[in-house]
Amino acid sequence: MSVKQSGQVFTPHYLVCNILDVANYSGKCILQKHIIDNSCGNGAFLCEIIHRYCKEFLTESTDKENLKKELQSYIHGIEIDEVAYRDCISNLNQIASTYGMENVDWDVRNDDTLKVRLFDEKMDYVIGNPPYVRVHNLNNQYSEVKKHRFAGSGMTDLYLVFFEI
């Protein structure tokens, strides 16, 4: 699938950090808050989120088993592309291992964000870099996109649906 069809462009680290800073994702206020990247790709945002979460948690506690539970409970992701999803899990595991944690059961799903409703209205932060795809390039996904308010009529981009979600 081409970039034009998938809208898949990975986010550079400096931009990830800037976006998280603008969203005020730092300090004690991030602990025990749900965050999702619903187009997580290879995990650029999730890796930085995990790094920030671990760093903040470890200023208060050395209980890595509890830290692991919190990472599994409060950090979420969705990625439709199976290769990017596997890369994401691998990248998250590398970050976790730098903090002395293994076998984290990440709440990252290889699924279509347009169809997942599990996380609706349950997040404290929604962050990421959604795909930029014109509706006429969506092929068979068009009927699902039309169900969303922003994409109800005329020409639009898929990224608007991700803002609505």
Predicted regions, residues:
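SAM-dependent methyltransferase catalytic region
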Residues: 1-165
